[in-house]
Amino acid sequence: MWKKKKVKAGVLLYAVTIAAIFSLLLQFYLNRQVAHYQDYALNKEKLVAFAMAKRTKDKVEQESGEQFFNLGQVSYQNKKTGLVTRVRTDKSQYEFLFPSVKIKEEKRDKKEEVATDSSEKVEKKKSEEKPEKKENS
């Protein structure tokens, strides 16, 4: 009988040791998963903030101003050193620096010039085609 008790205690000690090792491995794995998810959520938030800042950079119309998005708001200032954008979300605030941007009004003027030039070319072609038709008749 004395030997049977030792065997039972040995099996119980082995089972507790294996359970403790499994528990430690499970805890390590779960901590890795939680850290991975937190890192993913932070990177996603930074990416969304950068996308808002980039969109604001493309739509700059004044020297400074604000734009509002569903996920936050962006304030910007166009300085000599560059375009400073501050993105405020529900959870945090980010700041991005871009090269200085020309104001959009200048871009519009260029587009108008191009449109005017192309319409003038079309008018010239039409006026050149009319005399040719008269000569053929």
UniProtKB/Swiss-Prot annotation:
Residue ranges, annotated region (Disordered): 106-137
Keywords linked to the UniProt accession: Cell membrane, Competence, Fimbrium, Membrane, Transmembrane, Transmembrane helix
Keyword Kinase: no
InterPro entries tied to this protein: ComGG_streptococcus-type
Chief location of this protein within or outside the cell: other
Its membrane topology: Single-pass membrane protein
One Gene Ontology CC term in the entry: pilus
One Gene Ontology biological process: establishment of competence for transformation
Outcome of gene disruption: Prevents transformation pilus formation and transformation. Reduces level, but not processing, of ComGC. Reduces level of ComGD and abolishes detection of ComGF.
Location relative to the cell: Fimbrium; Cell membrane
Positions of transmembrane segments: 10-30
Function: Required for formation of the type IV-like pilus (T4P) that plays a role in transformation. Transformation pili are dynamically extended and retracted, perhaps thereby promoting DNA uptake and transformation. Required for transformation.
Record's subunit section: The transformation pili are flexible filaments, consisting mainly of the major pilin ComGC and smaller amounts of the minor pilins, including at least ComGD, ComGF and ComGG, and perhaps ComGE. Interacts with ComGC; the interaction is probably direct. Interacts with ComGD. Interacts with ComGE. Interacts with ComGF. May act as a link between ComGC, ComGD and ComGF.
Identification of the protein by name: Competence protein ComGG
Organism: Streptococcus pneumoniae (strain ATCC BAA-255 / R6)
Lineage: Bacteria, Bacillati, Bacillota, Bacilli, Lactobacillales
